[in-house]
């Protein structure tokens, strides 16, 4: 977990939210995680757990509790809508159970090669998500600006679009991941770019985070 604390110190000034995969932290303990969350809050960062919930509402509500108590510290979570809109109710109920509020980002598109989130499915996700107050926004495909333009048109201005699949080095990554440039993603309609290995695997994460922030902010100003 030392690396996570280091990230807050080195990239915190250049980001708005810190994306986590809590179940990938090998040395996780409740005590250390609590300290980590406190450090993120002190740095004025949202904690974005990229859990991609997909089960029915009741199970998702229980998963938000569970070993990691995601409901107790996450500000945002991701979810598929394949099981129906009740999943959003379940996730929101989990936050309510502990007196907190949070937002759900629904996966409307994905950037991985061969994914099954086709346009007809995307349209249904957007329609259901726009009508639900518990939906903060949507996940779009940052590697394909032409898809993002269509998503932006469908979503309108009432919800945000966050996009993974962006990298300053455009191309293909590991295990089917694809990358587009953050500027292109923002110009196409993204409100926030999600960067993982492009920052935390860099030789100088702080400099890279600042570079992504500048590229995306400049694009937003030009949009």
Predicted feature descriptions by range:
Residues 1-48, 55, 116-137, 143, ...:
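Conserved N-terminal beta1-alpha1 strand-loop-helix module at the mouth
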Residues 54-149, 154-159, 169-171:
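Conserved anion-binding
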């Amino acid at each position: 977990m030392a690396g996570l604390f280091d990230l807050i110190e080195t990239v915190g000034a250049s980001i708005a939210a810190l994306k986590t995969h809590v179940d990938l932290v090998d040395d996780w303990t409740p005590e250390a995680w609590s300290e980590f969350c406190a450090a993120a809050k002190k740095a004025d960062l949202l904690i974005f757990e990229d859990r991609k919930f997909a089960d029915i509402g009741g199970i998702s509500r229980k998963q938000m509790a569970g070993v990691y108590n995601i409901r107790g510290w996450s500000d945002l979570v991701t979810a598929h809508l394949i099981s129906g809109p009740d999943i959003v109710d379940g996730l929101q109920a989990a936050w309510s159970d502990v007196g907190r509020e949070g937002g759900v980002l629904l996966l409307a598109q994905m950037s991985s090669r061969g994914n099954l989130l086709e346009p007809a499915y995307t349209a249904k996700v957007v329609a259901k998500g726009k009508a639900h107050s518990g939906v903060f926004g949507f996940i779009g495909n940052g590697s394909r600006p032409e898809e993002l333009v269509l998503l932006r048109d469908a979503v309108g201005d009432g919800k945000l679009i966050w996009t993974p699949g962006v990298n300053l080095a455009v191309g293909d990554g590991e295990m089917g991941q694809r990358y587009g440039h953050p500027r292109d993603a923002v110009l196409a309609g993204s409100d926030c770019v999600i960067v993982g290995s492009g920052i935390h695997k860099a030789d100088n994460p702080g400099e890279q985070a600042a570079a992504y922030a500048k590229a995306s902010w400049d694009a937003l100003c030009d949009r």
